[in-house]
Amino acid sequence: MSTEEDPSLVDAEESMEEGSVTQDATEETEEEEEQEQGDEAGPSERKRSSRKKGGKGGKKGSKKSAAAASKVEIPDPYNSTSEEVCAAIGLTDVEFDYDEEEFQGISNLKTFSSIIKPQILEANPGTNVSKMYPMFQVKYKEYQDHMAAQGKPVQKQARGSKTPAVSTPVIPPRSAPTKTRSARRKRRDSDAPDSDQEFEAFIKQQEQLEDDLVKDKEDARIKRAAEREEKKKGALEAARAAKKAKLEKGEEAENNDYCEECKQDGELLLCDTCPRAYHTVCIDENMEEPPEGDWSCAHCIEHGPEVVKEEPAKQNDEFCKICKETENLLLCDSCVCSFHAYCIDPPLTEVPKEETWSCPRCETVKPEHKIEKILCWRWKEIPYPEPLEAGKEASSDDAMLKPPRKMEPRREREFFVKWKYLSYWQCSWVSEMLLEVHFRMLILLYWRKNDSDAPPEFEESVTSRHHSDNDPYKLRERFYQYGIKPEWMQIHRIINHQSYAKSQQDYLVKWKELSYDQATWERDDSNIANYEEAIIKYWQHRESKLNEDIPKNVQKMIAKHREAKGLPPKEDEKKKKKREKIDIRKKYEVQPDYVTETGGKLHPYQLEGLNWLRHCWSNGTDAILADEMGLGKTVQSLTFLYSLMKEGHCKGPFLIAAPLSTIINWEREAEQWCPDFYVVTYVGLRDARVVLREHEFSFVEGAVRSGPKASKMKTTENMKFHVLLTSYETINMDKTILSSIEWGALVVDEAHRLKNNQSLFFKNLNEYTIHYRVLLTGTPLQNNLEELFHLLNFLSKERFNQLEAFTAEFNEISKEDQIEKLHNLLGPHMLRRLKADVLTGMPSKSELIVRVELSAMQKKWYKNILTRNFDALNVKNGGTQMSLMNVLMELKKCCNHPYLFVKAELEAPKEKNGMYEGTALIKNSGKFVLLQKMLRKLKDGGHRVLIFSQMTRMLDIMEDLCEYEGYRYERIDGSIMGQMRQDAIDRYNAPGAQQFIFLLSTRAGGLGINLATADTVIIYDSDWNPHNDIQAFSRAHRLGQKHKVMIYRFVTKKSVEEKITSVAKKKMLLNHLVVRAGLGGKEGKTMSKTELDDVLRWGTEELFSEDLDAAEGEGSEKKGAAAQEIVWDDAAVDALLDRSNKEETPAGEDGEEKAEWQNEYLSSFKVASYQTKETEGQEEEEEEETEVIKEDEKEPDPDYWEKLLKHHYEQDREIELQKLGKGKRVRKQINYASENMGTDWSKQNQTQDDDDDNESYRGSDNGDGLNSDEDDYDEKKKRRRDEEKMPPLMAKVNGQVEILGFNPRQRKAFYGAVMRWGMPPQDSHQSQWLVRDLRNKSEKVFRAYASLFMRHLCEPGADGHDTFNDGVPREGLNRQHVLGRIGLLSLVRRKVQEFEQYNGQWSMPEIQDEVLAKAANGSAQGSSRSTPKPKEEPKEEPMEKEDATETVNGATSEPATDAESEQNAPVDEPMDTDEAKEPKEEPIETEKPRAARPSFKFNICDGGFTELHSLWANEEKVARNGKEYEIWYRRHDYWLLAGVVVHGYGRFQANFNDIINDPRFSVLNEPFKEVGAEATGSDIKAKFMQRRFKLIEQSLVIEEQLRRAAHANRHLQPDNVGPLAQRFADLENIAESQANIAKESSAGNRNANAVLHKTLVQLDEILSDMKADVSRLPSTFTQLATVTERLNMTERQILSRLTTKDEDAIANRSVLPPPGPFVTPILRQQMDGIQPKFAALYSKFMSENGERMEEDEPVEAEEEEGVKQEPDDETQDSAEAPPVLSAEVNSDDSNDVPSTSAAAAVSSETAADAEPASAEDQAPTDEPEPMET
């Protein structure tokens, strides 16, 4: 055979000679893969695969390989050493240890190469992998040789197997060829020798290789099978041995008791190596006898015995689980815990002797009942036993039982738990160990919501203890103080029983304020308060309904109770109770006896209503009781039903349907007026209604099918209740069971719910079987005659069944006949009385419309809404009625407050706690501006206010207003239901209640609520239906009201609200025409699209014309209503709040009848008088107030909106388009932290920061430079605002996390500043707050970080979390520690500010000049170090200090003198002024005689709770006769506090050494000079001052608590606004993140509908939680005298003075209270300046107080610091003497009149022609009169 005949031989030879070294990387990788495959396949397969890949190379590839081969000659890897190959290819050789584990089991070259490749690359970095393949081959050959020498031949040899030698040329020991490119090269080089013998030898070699491989595989398989058999045998023997060992120990064999094959029992053969068992027959049919000896089943023989994993040996802890100490431990045999015998509770008295001992955790028994919830927890102290005696050798038992040393008692937690299915009487304390062992998830959930460090405190735990006589069960100590409400432990009634013997029963008890599903079974001998009375009532009710015999034990109980009360036996009582049946037609002249027995007395008109209802019953006429709200319709209807039952006319049952909010009120009235009624309240959740139906509907067992779904009753005999009280919703939900009952009578409260016959309530109630119907409504007609017809149709279907005929009948006849016939029709069915008719002694009510202006922000939003909705408004575009209604609602929201819009809400300034900033909140709403003034005056007058609004979001904003003003309030809206609603009403109506305001939603808060303790009603926004507003203000004007009620209806001028008011007039007119006799009128209809459009147009033309007027300039002469602005000044507000009756009766004989009904129905549309502010250039002229009742109807202009809005609309569209599209767009600058994570913000803002350091604010030496400095400052501030960019919230710079640009060092510095000086003040960026590490921060960044820091402090959540809610790391911040420090330092700073104006800034003024002179002579650097510059006070402080009035030790606090004001200035200022030096020269020159000590004032009102005042009293006895400096007393205490304010609070104690070394506080060194050298050391001084400071600190805290409790006349921040802020943040986040869902939902996306529904539910839950939190936030307020009492004038005198123009009056002062500093109020002190001063009244007071005016000196007005008084020397000296308390001092004239100083008189005379000063530049000047302390 030649090469031409078989080219594969050439291919093979070439491959064997040259290998694959010269191939490229890709080909070598393929060769390696094929080589691995070739190990498994035969040579022919490898040749086929090589031939398959050979065709791709072509001739080009062959030339390339040949060239490479000729270029580098590589030795044969299989005949060379690794050193030779490495030298040839230029690589560094690497030695390997082939005995290592990683080289074991290698069978091919690929695996071997992957192992050695990394090490070769490490020795030869950068080498091409293709160059290493020869080295891989030679290393693999060496590895094979090494393994063969070790006797471990490689099973699968890739290469190297040698063939026998033949006479032909030797063929290298290679494997089959793998590449075809070499064959093509060889075919071209045909000179090489070849023969057939070589090929045959090669074939034989390959066949031998295959045979060897097959043989090796077979040998390995046989060897493995033998090893498995040996392993099985060994496992079987081991299993048998283990089983024998168990049997020898006496343990039972764990074999199955059934046959593994047939699964039957019987005589079984047990396997000795597994749990299986077999019948002998099932093993082998021919087996007669079981095998002898050890036997294993077929499964064990085949698979071996089951491997049993041995459990690792248990190791106990090496320390005690309680004390964590070692030695003398008891090891538990059931778990890994270890304990000391003395750490167990109770401690062990002897060492356990048992072989096995279980620890307390393992022995804790699971309780019989499950825990329903954890109520509270507390600390429990567990003492340790006495320790071992010292020096005495103890036995081993004593060492185990007693601690080695004295150990303090340890604290463990105990939990107060409520057990499931048990009452609150069974609540008990359990250990924390029991909860951790058996209820771990419950306690983990509890710790998520509660603090694990401080036990919770409840209201009952901090209130005063009850007397033991009133609390025989000690319920407060056992239950109430741990979170259990008293009502939960009071029996409501017993609803069922079970008898076990003749005298043993269990009772099912329903508890007060708990639903029926929480009723519990109690034994009859349980020790429960009033249990026996409830048992007696239960059996007496069964006896009255079923004539069932009472058990003997209960009869004995009844006899015992009657005997204790002195009542006759029950038999005698029965005889007396037999009453004759009373004729139903009988009219009661006096109320019946059964009503009198209740203790109540009906009013004469209520008795008349009872007789009328009885009369209607006798005639079979269904009735409508339509008395006005507040006349007691509930009482009349209940007594009517009670009379039917008592007199035997009807036994019931009766059904009462009422709004859910009034259910509790119905229950109370029924309990009071109908004691024998069994009233069941059928409301609540599904589980509660299931229990109620089963136990309260019928005495017959099984009459009601059990289950969650209501079904028809099987029988209606023996009904259990007399009255079923339920809600409208339950009427619809459980119609099935309720409609199956035959009702004796139905009472529907607020029956106008039946005005629509298409409503579900109307239809369902019509299907009930009802014999008699009574409807209660205070507003029988709300909209039109159609609604009245539906009420009549519900009452009498037979008579009123055709609506069309009814309406046609009244439209065809004349007005007079129509009215007369309608009244005749209603007469038999309806009874209506008004308060004015029946309650002649009831206080009257006055109703006023209060017009207000839109604020600038509201005008902007109003115009924006109209412009944005141009398409909907434009008639040509065909706007629908629904779209117009949407626009109308948006405009109503704008009239209420712009913060109701999401965008305005997000942009609104907010406080740190998330609430709106008060000033902006009030300024941005015209209604709020007036509301603030009204509420302040109403609060001063002792009135209480109800505020109604339709929008619950508006109530949220009002809550922020109340918090800002410091008013306590309650709230009710649709989300507050049931008991929470009634609790809020009870709190507000309680005697002495502090709540000033009640916020209510018009619809939810206007039904069945009694708030007669309020005398002022403010309807913030009117309802479309005026009857809803009437329902609302009738909450106050009702029975029980003792004061005149004022109703104020806010209406925004020239807005949609004005037009809505006119619509309300039409509805009221219709009500009068139908229900009461009077004038005629047309039927009101629902507003059409045209009428709605007319409402929207109202006032828009004037609103948009303001822009044109502003463009024309101030010189425009255009006049009209639009040029006037309503101004509610003090005089107008006083007139508005005047409650004197000034109503004028309309004149004329013809108008008397008309006035009678118009005053009743339309009096709410009287317009309050107000002042208008004329624009400049207009003459003052009075304009008549014209009220438009009706106008001629004009055809609406179809082009109105186009003319008005089109220009604005197109302009807005153009601006919008500028922001979109291609090209440069208007971009909004937003700070995204992710974009600048790596920016170094400190470098970016370095320029601005340097400016802050170099040009920080310094007070100017004279007033001339102020304006220029302010201009420069404003310009600089504007430039920075434009240029500076805020750093991101979190960024990583140089490996450190920065928060708003603050690195860890700067954050630590800021924290240190907070802990040293407290909360950052407004001027913190210019004060000592700016420590060295923070000086490179700009003011903007500094304030932003301070705000973030304070927000984190107020954030709710446990301190254990790693981050705050916004992701900022906590870094170990302890909120309680920081807040406590801030509170303490604020008290210290406040106390120092209070007396700083009297005491100055130098403790020893006589050394001030000397110190300053030394400082001036020294170098600048030295002086700055030796003489610290006094702390600069903020600019606002001088103004604040004037209001900080205080009476201390009987001394009158006078304003600061000029000398004191100079002391308050910076120290460098007096050096350039002679005035400052003159008063100081005299003490310096006369140093020999002892200088007179300066006057001093200081006090802390701690109420005697500390020993501070007793110390002061003793010290002041000694500190006299010139020893004021040498003896430590209150003077030194004040300067110690002042030093803490300047130098701050140290890390562990105040920096007392710095304070001592400060010359300003030199007086602190004086007491130590006379003690001696030993006591003058700085450490001794510091320790003394530290103890003294702790005492003062305690006194300040107590003073603050007393101030809050007794005088509560300052707004305080709520204690816990963390949860509210968190929920508000969650609300904002959810609303923002789901903003696009609403759009997708409206577009028809079904998936978006589901998401939107879930989002709305989540928002609703968050809002409910927020409302509940806000209702519990504390806020305080002040009660001041009325305006008339303070001014000592009548209302008429005030009005006459105010209306008289006073040319000489000075400008009014601000009505706002001064912003600070903080005043410590004393008893009966009234703050001057809070009540506005009337300019017109100055002449009166100046004349009455002329003497006092002459004594005072003129007042100098200083810029931005208000007005200060400068008393003369006599006044200053007399201020130190305690004044005598007299009637003149305490009179109202002296405290409440405006300033009576001569300065006021002079300024009033000179300010006649001057420009009035702004309210901000003025401050009150007079001080309150003192009182002795």
UniProtKB/Swiss-Prot annotation:
The entry's note on the tissues where this protein occurs is:
Expressed in embryos and larva.
Keyword Nucleotide-binding annotated: yes
Q: Which residues form the Helicase C-terminal domain?
A: 930-1093
Q: What happens when the gene is disrupted?
A: Larval arrest, protruding vulva, sterile progeny.
Q: Any idea what this protein is called? A: Protein let-418
GO cellular component terms, alphabetically, are: chromatin; nucleus; NuRD complex; RNA polymerase II transcription repressor complex
Q: Which GO terms describe its molecular function?
A: ATP binding; ATP hydrolysis activity; ATP-dependent chromatin remodeler activity; chromatin binding; DNA binding; helicase activity; histone binding; RNA polymerase II-specific DNA-binding transcription factor binding
Point to the regions of Basic residues compositional bias.
48-63
Every Helicase ATP-binding domain range: 614-798
**Upper lineage:** Eukaryota, Metazoa, Ecdysozoa, Nematoda, Chromadorea
Compositional bias, Acidic residues, is annotated for 1-17, 25-39, 1177-1186, 1749-1773, 1819-1829
